[in-house]
């Protein structure tokens, strides 16, 4: 059966909230809000004001995990300062899920490459999750969307290295590339299934650079904004975003497509689909004003 993906070309904070209401999926209990806090120096990440209506609606807690590379977010102290500087703690409760160990380990018995996922231990404190993704390019994954947020985004600092290294954290930058992409698909499955259906995905196709929000020095957006998508299927929503980029007549789309293709970005979606926790087949339902 095709997954439903709702789509609007209007990109406003209020429209994000409206799309959640259109989806008709009520998240229950204490809700983790997974988003990207933005590397210091990055100009493209989506700011707190943009997400405020949906987070306030859910009374959600913004959750993040420390990075596994040098920068402004690789230690708890630096990351909290960056979160404050970027305005997140001004509006929301913020939880660095891996600020204190030990990591929470999610088993992935059906994982193709990795059978364990190391996530921030505070994940156990939440009943559900909304994954707020800024869709854009990525220097390693080709693109960043819902699957990246589920995997790398929810992984602890060690867990990020473990995924990048395809199960060998010391190979963080040297592992076989497709094995890294398949590890992301494995890890994403464990988080998606952990919340037992009490999870929603929103992808925003705005400020689309070839670079991720994890880059302190990032290229400016290369193509015009496209819209907001929402679904309960992380695979379908990422596939829909990829398809919208390819369908665009924007003169800058080729630059983003080159980034996706040169990093074999579609393979993460292929690997996730093979694991069966979502579908690449979807019905795109456009919501008009």
Where are these regions (language model features)?
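Extended, low-polarity segments enriched in aliphatic/aromatic residues
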Residues: 1-289
